[in-house]
């Protein structure tokens, strides 16, 4: 609500009553003046309340006439100004009239009192009273006229406000009508645009449906074509398969007939097809005939074998030809098979245990009731599908001459089920040039390790080194080979990482000597373990066992650098125990002439099917280069009493 100004007009002159006024404002008794002052304040408060009530009533009336946001805003501004002016005018008139009336009444009362005390005359008092009454009448009349004037102004301002409101309402209505017209035009335009867009969408949809239907028809036709083609191809394939099955059936019948004929032929010609029992038991030693238990002859079929070093006489089953060279004697039924002299089985010669004889059954065979040569079970021999071999399943093993029943014995721990692989002496000739790649000969023997020894095995043998044996160049003797089923396993020949599919533990000779842990020369005469680990386990070995060079890894070299006796038999035992999968708890056992040493923390295998498969004696010089190769003399080593046992360390 707007502030209300309340001016107070003080009448200083009333018909030269200055003295009266001075008396009223002096220091005389003021009891009457105080009373009139209270009246004046009350009148002012009443006037303020009346003005406020008028203002509130006006506000309520104005609100009742408001009919919209625009009208309300205009009316509010105009009404506030009019109300403020009317209130101020009414209060001014009322206050002035009341003030003058109060002053006159006060003057009249004062005059009466003064006249009573003789200060003024009674006539002067009456005159003052009359002047006050006239002034009161004049003031009231002025108030009435002012009120009328103010009322007229109020009516005029209200009329103006109403006109402004009407104009504003008209303008707002016009604007609203214009907006509605424009909105209608815009809506019409948008509707027309929407209708055009809809028509275009409908046309595009119809076109898309048409294209889709055409594509669908094309796809269905293509599918029918492909289906028909596949059906045709399938029918052709069925016919082809049927035809192939017919051909295979015919071939199968022919194969069965051929197999039956082959079996019949083998039974009839078994004597000619059976190989003589070789000294290799594979899977037990094959009982092949050996013409001489001594050093192997070294004849060559063309131009003829050179006479082997040693005695001047030719070995057994050999004779000198016209050039003075020892060759296989065909008169004794002996021929050269590329490695040695053997019975000429192609021409009906067979080994009878002592010599090649014409028409006799091969060694370890006997004639059955039909007169055919068959494997003799009384001699512990059985047929393995290729030839007669020792019946290892029933405890028969090859001792170098015949199949014998296995016995006990051994060393290097608790052993059981000892198998003698070779009891007789055999000589490994190491003539000059035996070094690999340089020609000459190398000694090779191989035996299978039975299943009960495939996880822990002890190999024992005796070896003879002559007095002139040269240890200056290292060489291999033999030992264990490990692999997976059906695999030979690569664990020799300087196999590089990534190609080592097997493992091996062989004995190696060498002349390396040490002093205070340092290598000082090659004048020793020792043997030591020589190892290859497969790719899956080498990286998991302890540092002293890890193979860092391609050509194997040697251990215990210093300890056994002078372990061999020259010109005497030496006993060697090597033991190998597999580790538990995932653990380094395998063993290496090495013993020479009673000197023993064991290496633990070995990881031989990372798979349950990787185990000990063979004992192989591959004897040759291999471990020197340059001029040392030319220093290899014509020499030899001898073996005997080769045995394997189940080892329980």
Curated annotation (Swiss-Prot):
The keyword Secreted does not apply. Its cofactor is Ca(2+); Mg(2+). It is found in: Membrane; Virion. It is a single-pass membrane protein. Residues 278-312 have a biased composition (Pro residues). Residues 184-268 form a coiled coil. GO terms for molecular function: lyase activity. Its EC number is 4.2.2.-. Residues 258-275 have a biased composition (Basic and acidic residues). It is an enzyme of class 4 (lyase). Its main location: membrane. Residues 258-325 are annotated as: Disordered. InterPro entries: Exolysin_DUF5874, Polysacc_lyase_14. The chain crosses the membrane at residues 37-57. Pfam families: DUF5874 (PF19202), Polysacc_lyase_14 (PF21294). One of its GO terms (biological process) is symbiont entry into host cell via disruption of host cell envelope. Keywords: Coiled coil, Degradation of host cell envelope components during virus entry, Lyase, Membrane, Transmembrane, Transmembrane helix, Virion, Virus entry into host cell. One of its GO terms (cellular component) is membrane. The C-terminus displays the cell wall degrading activity. During viral entry, involved in the degradation of the host cell wall at the site of attachment. This is Exolysin. It comes from Paramecium bursaria Chlorella virus 1.
